[in-house]
Amino acid sequence: MLVSRAQLGAAIARARTKAGMTQAELANMAGLDEATIAALERGQYRPESHELSRLAEALSVDELDLLRRPAPGYLII
């Protein structure tokens, strides 16, 4: 199931917010630059598979949860 960069970025931003992390904290935990996290959340960057694994681990979520498309009619807030 392929999601757009914008959908993936939104999923990561939601997971980060739910975890109570700043972009800087997530970047540090995932071994990425803060600018990369910001670009990712804006839908301007698609992470490599190893980066996605590190992000999911840092966020304590399954990689597939980040890659799932919302169901039709599902409101994302």
Regions found by a protein language model. Name each.
Residues 12, 23, 34, 49-52:
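Helix-turn-helix DNA-binding elements, focusing on the entry/boundary residues of the two helices
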Residues 16, 27, 56:
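The alpha-helix within a helix-turn-helix
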Residues 67-77:
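Short, charged recognition helix plus adjacent turn
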